[in-house]
């Protein structure tokens, strides 16, 4: 490949609304250009990277036994009504009409279409299991598309769907796909974590997300130093606390005139924040509760909502708080003589002794509070908090917190769609059995942006070798000055290509500084400079993108370095 024959247009100008590094660098490198809100054209350079990601995904899916297919992006309303998602999916579903006024949607996902295909094609248990996948354009009508291709309305996705006779076989394929995703992201050269996740509205018995670690990630992850345990922050758990501490203090009421925040109370009393207990008033279908957390912890809404009777909980308002406790936020507490309060204590709070709580009196807190003496044992003890950095993990390691960008997700869907769409096969006894499903998605175009978020510097992109547009750039200095220089570069290009090294020849005749800046910006892993001075010395200038070291190497050493 010669850059003189390739459309490469880099720029220093970027729109003011380009917030993420990946968005800015993709625009500067000329990988994408905005067509409309949330819609991007992939340039020849950008497409080279996208295709390399697709190739790795396709190779590993095929290796895992999945079979590629292609479903229409435009799908009829009737299918989505069968699954009851025509209305439930919300405004992200782009609905359109043809000239006959028949209604369709632009597919954001393909559970309905693939289930329709399978129910027509499969009739016997002998045809199961099957795992079908596609790499296809999707569309979700995001209300506020932003961050370039990271959250575009149109995107490229690999979505796979497996169909099984029973749950045991679904679990087997789910584990197969988890292992496949691990191989995919390893080959992509990305630092990632597979995390336990909440299944959310899509349902299912098991759900795991794959996140690329990056400071700009929207999701907060917790992972252990002791094993491969990792989870989304809403699903992460810490080790069970030890036995309850011994009580040593007597109950006292102290003045805290303006101290409403736990941090301020701890500072006033000159005690660790971990000794203060915060009381969060919540209303549920069964009434008023106080949820108790340690002062340095935060409430995990999802964990709390999963407790019996708390699915629809909400925070109590000031009127409700005053009616039940006769106080106001900032001074609430569970010690209420003669006024029993239903208490949900986090596991950490349940083993505390000599702790501090609000006195249910404005301007006062209670110190030296102990279970069983000053207040009854909690009605419910449960893990209702978010883990924090340094918590003891369930495997004995320490919890670390990082941010991640979700690029893959695997679900055990179960029979949700198959039941709704009557997708059955006959079992070995001739009885109709509803198939059970798994679904496995990878955001192909999002991976490109996530890779940049994780791998860049002030000069530009630092691609992992497996997805760089080219492995090597051969830069020719003054190609028109001396045909010998160009000839030497052509020979080197041919040698690298014959060794299956994806190489581009920069023969545009630009100033060296401009050429080098472009190669750094677009992230080519290896740069070789062919110059009159170097040829006279029998060497080529070499630099790896991830270092600042420039070396002058003879051809044999150079080729060995590139192929290593």
UniProtKB/Swiss-Prot annotation:
Q: How does it assemble?
A: Homodimer.
Q: Which Gene3D superfamilies match?
A: Anticodon-binding domain (3.40.50.800), Bira Bifunctional Protein, Domain 2 (3.30.930.10), YbaK/aminoacyl-tRNA synthetase-associated domain (3.90.960.10)
Record Pfam families: HGTP_anticodon (PF03129), tRNA-synt_2b (PF00587), tRNA_edit (PF04073)
The record's comment about this protein's domains reads: Consists of three domains: the N-terminal catalytic domain, the editing domain and the C-terminal anticodon-binding domain.
Where, per UniProt, does this protein localize? Cytoplasm
Q: What is this protein called?
A: Proline--tRNA ligase
NCBIfam families on file: PRK09194.1, proS_fam_II
What does this gene product do? Catalyzes the attachment of proline to tRNA(Pro) in a two-step reaction: proline is first activated by ATP to form Pro-AMP and then transferred to the acceptor end of tRNA(Pro). As ProRS can inadvertently accommodate and process non-cognate amino acids such as alanine and cysteine, to avoid such errors it has two additional distinct editing activities against alanine. One activity is designated as 'pretransfer' editing and involves the tRNA(Pro)-independent hydrolysis of activated Ala-AMP.
Q: Which GO terms describe its biological process?
A: prolyl-tRNA aminoacylation
Q: Which HAMAP family does UniProt cross-reference here?
A: Pro_tRNA_synth_type1
PANTHER family xrefs: MITOCHONDRIAL RIBOSOME PROTEIN L39/PROLYL-TRNA LIGASE FAMILY MEMBER, PROLINE--TRNA LIGASE
Q: Which GO terms describe its molecular function?
A: aminoacyl-tRNA deacylase activity; ATP binding; proline-tRNA ligase activity
Which CDD domains does this UniProt record tie to the protein?
ProRS-INS (cd04334), ProRS_anticodon_short (cd00861), ProRS_core_prok (cd00779)
Report the InterPro entries cross-referenced here: aa-tRNA-synt_IIb, aa-tRNA-synth_II, aa-tRNA-synth_II/BPL/LPL, Anticodon-bd, Anticodon-bd_dom_sf, Pro-tRNA-ligase_IIa, Pro-tRNA-synth_IIa_bac-type, Pro-tRNA-Synthase_IIa_type1
């Amino acid at each position: 490949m010669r850059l003189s024959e390739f459309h490469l247009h880099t720029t220093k100008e970027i729109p003011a609304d380009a917030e993420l590094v990946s968005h800015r660098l993709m625009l500067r490198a000329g990988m994408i250009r905005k067509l409309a809100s949330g819609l991007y054209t992939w340039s020849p350079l950008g497409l080279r990277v996208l295709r390399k990601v697709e190739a790795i995904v396709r190779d590993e899916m095929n290796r895992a036994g999945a079979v590629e297919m292609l479903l229409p992006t435009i799908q009829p309303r009737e299918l989505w009504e069968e699954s009851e998602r025509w209305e439930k999916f919300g405004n992200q579903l782009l609905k359109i009409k043809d000239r006959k006024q028949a209604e369709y949607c632009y597919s954001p996902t393909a559970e309905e279409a693939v289930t329709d295909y399978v129910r027509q094609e499969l009739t016997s248990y002998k045809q199961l299991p099957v795992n079908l996948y596609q790499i296809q354009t999707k569309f979700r009508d995001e209300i506020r598309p932003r961050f370039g291709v990271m959250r575009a309305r149109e995107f490229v996705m690999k979505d796979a769907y497996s169909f099984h006779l029973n749950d045991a076989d679904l679990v087997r394929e789910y584990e197969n796909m988890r292992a496949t995703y691990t191989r995919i992201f390893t080959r992509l050269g990305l630092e990632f974590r597979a995390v336990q996740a909440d299944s959310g509205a899509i349902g299912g018995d098991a759900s795991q997300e794959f996140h690329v670690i990056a400071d700009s990630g929207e999701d907060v992850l917790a992972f252990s130093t002791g094993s491969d345990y990792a989870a989304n922050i809403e699903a992460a758990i810490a080790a069970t606390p030890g036995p309850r501490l011994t009580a040593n203090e007597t109950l006292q009421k102290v003045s805290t005139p303006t101290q409403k925040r736990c941090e301020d109370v701890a500072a006033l009393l000159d005690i660790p924040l971990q000794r203060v207990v915060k009381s969060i008033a919540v209303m549920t279908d069964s009434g008023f509760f106080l949820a108790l957390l340690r002062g340095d912890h935060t409430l995990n809404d999802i964990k709390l909502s999963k407790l019996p009777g708390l699915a629809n909980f909400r925070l109590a308002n000031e009127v409700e708080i005053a009616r039940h406790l006769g106080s106001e936020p900032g001074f609430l507490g569970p010690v209420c003589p003669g006024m029993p309060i239903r208490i949900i204590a986090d596991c950490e709070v349940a083993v505390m002794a000599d702790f501090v709580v609000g006195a249910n009196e404005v301007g006062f807190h209670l110190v030296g509070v102990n279970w069983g003496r000053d207040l009854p044992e909690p009605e419910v003890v449960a893990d209702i908090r978010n883990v924090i950095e340094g918590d003891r993990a369930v495997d004995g390691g320490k919890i670390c917190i990082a941010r991640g960008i979700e690029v893959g997700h695997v679900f055990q869907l179960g029979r949700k769609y198959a039941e709704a769409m009557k997708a059955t096969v006959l079992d070995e006894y001739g009885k109709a059995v509803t198939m059970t499903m798994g679904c496995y998605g990878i955001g192909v175009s999002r991976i490109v942006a996530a890779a940049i978020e994780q791998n860049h510097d002030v000069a530009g992109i630092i691609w992992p070798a497996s997805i760089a547009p080219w492995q090597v750039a051969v830069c020719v200095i003054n190609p028109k000055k001396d045909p010998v220089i160009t000839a030497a570069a052509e020979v080197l290009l041919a040698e690298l290509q014959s060794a299956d090294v994806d190489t581009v020849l920069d023969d545009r005749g630009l100033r060296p500084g401009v050429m080098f800046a472009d190669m750094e910006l677009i992230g080519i892993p290896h740069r070789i400079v062919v110059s009159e001075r170097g040829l006279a010395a029998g060497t080529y200038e070499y630099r790896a993108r991830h270092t600042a070291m420039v070396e002058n190497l003879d051809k044999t050493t150079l080729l060995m370095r590139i192929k290593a």
